[in-house]
Amino acid sequence: MAIRSWTPEGFVNKKLVRPASVSTNLSLELCTFPTTLGSSVAANALEQLFVVEKSLQGDYFTCSEEVKTFLKDITVAVKKLEEMRKNTVELLEIESMELSRLYFLLETVPNSIHRELEECIADARKLNIIEISQIKRKIETMNNEVKFLTNKISELKSMNEVLGAKQAELAKRHEQYVLLLNQTLEEKAAATIYINDTYTRMNFEREEIELQKQCMQETTQLIEKQKQDYLEKKEYLAIRIKETKQSCDDKRKETYYKKKELTRLQNKIIKMKQTVTSGSVMISDQSIEINILHEAITIWKKKVEDMRRLCESLEEKLSFFVTQKQNLDTTSTEKKNAFVNKIQKLGEKIYKLNTENEDLREKLSTLLKQYKATLKEEEAVSLKKQMLSEEHQKQMMVITQKEAFLSQREHDIKFMENGFGVLNDLNRASREAYGRQIEVMAKNRQREIQRCVINQWRIFCTRKRHAHWLQKIKLSLKKIIIQIEIVEQKRFQLLEETKHRKKEINHFVHLIETLKEQLAQDKKDYVKKEERLIEELGTYETLILNEIQINKVKEEELGETLPQLQVAEEDFREKNRMLRSLHSDVSAKKQDEKTMSNTIFRYRKDIIRCTDGTENMKREIKHLRDLESEKTHKHFEILKNLENEIYVNDQKMALLILENQKLREYLAYLKKEINEYASKQVVTVQHSGDLSWQLIVQHSHYSDLLSGFQIIIKELVGTGEDTMQEIKSLVAKLQYRDEKIESISTWLVGGFERLRRLMEEDSPASLSKEDLQKLGKKQKNQEILRFSPSSHARRLTLSRICKMLKKQSRSRKKKHRPRTII
């Protein structure tokens, strides 16, 4: 190597001058960089991230905690990148100052040192190019591995989609079975309600019939009391008539004796006249006394004429009373006959009513038997209905939880998509900025490598750092590969378990189909029974009310499920926290393995339980209705466990989309069913209207009959009261007549005694033949006017009436006897 002078001219060699690679000026044009290094993109990204951070710190930003933590990590990483960028800018400025100083020194360095430096820089470039190529190859291998993993993930997604579709089909079948059971139970409940209504109506009719019976009994008791009173009064009147007859007979005998005495007196008078005629000579002295007696006789004749007039008036009164008595007897007999006819008609009506009551009692007994049988069936059905309602509530709870979970996941997905788009934009902008920066840095680096030797030491240090970084990456990749292998093993185990569970589900589906057929047969039998009951009982009035009540209950249940949605959200947040802890802690994977082993042990226990349940189902097939609820409950638990496993193992977007589709289909299905229920409701309303009109017509007919019967009873009661009043008035009249007759008889007895005294006082000669004839005529007339024909007619009428009443009472007793037995 030639020694050159240390002058500035000696440093300059025209052959070695490279203006393209080395700068001859003292300026920093080649080593200057932009002060921001993509500051516009970074500033925009930072502004967006600061907005996101503020929204995360606030309460109005609704997002899942996973997304929040993810965005917070991104903000922290971007802040670190910004700090690194600033540090790199500062370091680049320091290096630019050093490079400018080195450029100045290089101008004063000889050419030999310049060549050596250029060779070193060229070797360093080659080494850097080789290392860069190796790093690119490693990056390509890593990208290939990432693609392979993405393909595996897509395959797993497809498997999960298939499993989700199968699960949706199973859920649809389960919903159909539950809906069929609900329909049958609703029909049974409607039938029970209708039976209860009919039973209440029958009880009401029974009460009305009992009230009518009580009214009839009261009327019969009143009639019997009136009969007893009438018979007592009749007996009293008969006794009085007998007494009057006896008194009349006694009076006749007395008059007969009096007639005999009068004849004796007449004979004595004749004898006295004979004696008077024979002794007229001797009685001349007594002529004055005879004249006095004649005057007394004239006075007595006047008195006798007055008595005769009084007797004639009394005879007229007696004839008037006899005619009135005959008229009253005829009217009373006619009224009695009318009352007897009415009583006979009432007895016939009562007999008809009793026969109708017997028929109704027989019908009631048959209906009670049927009602008891239906009650037993309804109790069994009610127990099953309670079990099914509990299971249905649990299923609705799970469905609402899923809906809430899906809605929350939809919101999370939207926020994630927005965040993912923002992050993609940030990534693109940062890549573009860093690409530009890398290009500028590479160009400047090449120039700087040509200019400085200190970078070799930095390159050596970076190689060491790079080797250390490669070792770390290799270790991390090995760990990731081990984790992937563990995950694949778990996936394989899960696939095997899913296959086993598919077999079990198919077995359960087969059992459910058999149960469905048996339920259909039971339903047909029950429908036949219901048709018979409906033909006898009649109406479906309460179906609309029951449906309205069921809709209200469903609305209340939907309102009650809102707090359960909040509980489900809290559970979801807790699960997300658990997932964060699992992602953050690598050491927890061993615990996951333990938990997986525990879950496998639990699954085995569940499988053993399922096998035990199937054996119990085989034994207890006869008790289908009791086992339906248990089987559905077990099936529901198995499905729930499967869903939970799928949720734990597959936390990805495809399953959420599928579940959203399922929910939409289920809502459409519910809308269809609601429309069908509405159409059925219209039909049932029409049928119930027709049947209600028939019931109203029958009820009106029955009420008309009842009102007629009540009117007849009221008329009978009124006529009975009228007859009682008439009988009382007749008894009063008869008592008044008897009193008058007794007064007349006493007056006549007094008159006869007076006549007897007068006859004893008077002489027989003083009475003439004409007077005697008149007295005999009076006595004959008096004998004729002793009421013998009227009393005889009274006796006959009273005896006839008594016989008629006795016959009627006997016939009524005969008619009433079987009724009392019933």
From Swiss-Prot:
Keyword Coiled coil: yes
Coiled-coil ranges from the UniProt annotation: 129-164, 223-397, 510-537
Source organism, top-level taxon: Eukaryota
UniProt entry tagged with the keyword Coiled coil: yes
Alphabetized UniProt keyword annotations: Coiled coil
InterPro entries: CCDC175
PANTHER family: COILED-COIL DOMAIN-CONTAINING PROTEIN 175 (PTHR35347:SF1)
Protein name: Coiled-coil domain-containing protein 175
Phylogenetic classification of the source organism: Eukaryota, Metazoa, Chordata, Craniata, Vertebrata
